[in-house]
Amino acid sequence: MATVTILSPKSIPKVTDSKFGARVSDQIVNVVKCGKSGRRLKLAKLVSAAGLSQIEPDINEDPIGQFETNSIEMEDFKYGYYDGAHTYYEGEVQKGTFWGAIADDIAAVDQTNGFQGLISCMFLPAIALGMYFDAPGEYLFIGAALFTVVFCIIEMDKPDQPHNFEPQIYKLERGARDKLINDYNTMSIWDFNDKYGDVWDFTIEKDDIATR
């Protein structure tokens, strides 16, 4: 069965002659315009998919503080939790038994040595000998007081153990920070305070710690 195709007169482009040359009918021009608009639509979709049509966010050009944290105000920023810094929180320590706490305190104290260790070992035997030979109680109290004073002076003059510094200390330049912490762990507390006492005041300008 044959099919007859009927062409509408309007579907056939008309070409008319004029003194300026041939002219194509408006239907072909419309087809060309549709083709161009289709290419533009594809190009717009491609640009949108690549993210090139997004609006660029405003850049924060305000002055930024030295210790300012992103997205969280300094008053609300929990140091040690959010940044993972070496910070101690007493509430996080699991509380054990009374004798366990005493054992932990004893283990945390370094063993005495030198002259301090000598007077520590002689203290209780000296008190026992004084009571055995019926020494006057005043002498025993004076001896105990002298022992306490000498023992505490020697203990306080020892370098402190590594502990938690303020967050600003960890934000110092690496060389200055390591030197500061090393001096803290090796110097007596009195010499350290004389040398670095102003470091804890972050409101004043300071020279380079590494040169001290």
UniProtKB/Swiss-Prot annotation:
<keyword id="KW-0812">Transmembrane</keyword>
<dbReference type="GO" id="GO:0009535">
    <property type="term" value="C:chloroplast thylakoid membrane"/>
</dbReference>
<keyword id="KW-0150">Chloroplast</keyword>
<feature type="transit peptide" description="Chloroplast">
    <location>
        <begin position="1"/>
        <end position="48"/>
    </location>
</feature>
<dbReference type="GO" id="GO:0009507">
    <property type="term" value="C:chloroplast"/>
</dbReference>
<dbReference type="GO" id="GO:0031969">
    <property type="term" value="C:chloroplast membrane"/>
</dbReference>
<keyword id="KW-1133">Transmembrane helix</keyword>
<dbReference type="GO" id="GO:0006979">
    <property type="term" value="P:response to oxidative stress"/>
</dbReference>
<feature type="transmembrane region" description="Helical; Name=1">
    <location>
        <begin position="115"/>
        <end position="135"/>
    </location>
</feature>
<keyword id="KW-0934">Plastid</keyword>
<comment type="function">
    <text>NDH shuttles electrons from NAD(P)H:plastoquinone, via FMN and iron-sulfur (Fe-S) centers, to quinones in the photosynthetic chain and possibly in a chloroplast respiratory chain. The immediate electron acceptor for the enzyme in this species is believed to be plastoquinone. Couples the redox reaction to proton translocation, and thus conserves the redox energy in a proton gradient.</text>
</comment>
<comment type="subunit">
    <text>Part of the chloroplast NDH complex, composed of a mixture of chloroplast and nucleus encoded subunits. Component of the NDH subcomplex B, at least composed of PnsB1, PnsB2, PnsB3, PnsB4 and PnsB5.</text>
</comment>
<keyword id="KW-0472">Membrane</keyword>
<protein>
    <recommendedName>
        <fullName>Photosynthetic NDH subunit of subcomplex B 5, chloroplastic</fullName>
    </recommendedName>
</protein>
<keyword id="KW-0809">Transit peptide</keyword>
<feature type="transmembrane region" description="Helical; Name=2">
    <location>
        <begin position="136"/>
        <end position="156"/>
    </location>
</feature>
<dbReference type="InterPro" id="IPR034569">
    <property type="entry name" value="PNSB5"/>
</dbReference>
<keyword id="KW-0813">Transport</keyword>
<dbReference type="GO" id="GO:0009536">
    <property type="term" value="C:plastid"/>
</dbReference>
